[in-house]
Design a protein with these regions (language model features):
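N-terminal targeting signals for export/organelle localization
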Residues: 1-12, 167-175
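Short, flexible segments with low predicted structural confidence
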Residues: 11, 28-29, 55, 113-114, ...
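A short beta-strand-turn-helix
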Residues: 13-31
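Generic structural "secondary-structure junction" signal
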Residues: 23-25, 72, 162
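Sterically constrained small-residue positions within well-ordered secondary structures
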Residues: 23-25, 56, 144
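Structural alpha/beta surface segment adjacent to cysteine/selenocysteine redox centers
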Residues: 36-39, 44-117
Length: 175
């Protein structure tokens, strides 16, 4: 049996588009808000499977992506929290770093927390960022909106997770 996210409890109106990593034009008519954790295998699946579709929609000016790196208390996801500290605020650089973090996830996914930081610095050559306030804002926003699981994606009235198929995603973007 496949687990399905209960979207009925999520308060989409409490999700904002002003904090997070913004990919694409501010003039785009729609915002695709993505709550992800870099250690989550389902977030990796979402990121990789939606990458081309979202990249095309951003390039065509249809959407602006707002990626919110969500720190989670779950032990396995805390490694993602550490990696979040190393993602740059520059959108293009951040997108590349997120891609690198997901590509190497199987390497660092079981490291001790200190080792994740060392891997980010020494192997991936990421620099630690002063983003604690932003991370706290995103966590508070997720709590207010009752977002419990990652990935959670909000596009207008639509709230979904990584199980969305490409055709449905494209239809939501085109609406």
């Amino acid at each position: 049996m496949c687990f399905r996210m209960d979207i009925s409890v999520i308060k989409g109106k409490l999700v904002n588009d002003f904090n997070g990593i913004k990919i694409g034009s501010e003039k785009a008519p729609k915002r695709l808000i993505e709550f992800i954790n870099l250690r989550c295998p389902y977030c990796k699946l979402w990121f990789e499977e939606s990458y081309d579709t979202l990249n095309q929609a951003v390039t065509e000016g249809k959407i602006q992506r707002v990626i919110k790196l969500l720190d989670k208390d779950k032990i396995s996801l805390q490694r993602g929290n550490v990696m979040h500290e190393y993602i740059d605020t520059d959108p293009e650089k951040a997108l590349t770093q997120i891609q690198q973090a997901f590509e190497t996830q199987t390497i660092w996914q079981d490291f001790e927390l200190e080792a994740v930081a060392e891997y980010a610095e020494k192997t991936l050559r990421f620099n630690q960022q002063a983003n604690q306030i932003l991370q706290s804002e995103i966590r508070n926003e997720a709590e207010q909106a009752n977002i419990k699981f990652v990935p959670t994606i909000v596009l207008g009235e639509h709230i979904f997770d990584e199980s969305i198929d490409e055709a449905t995603l494209k239809s939501y973007i085109a609406e």
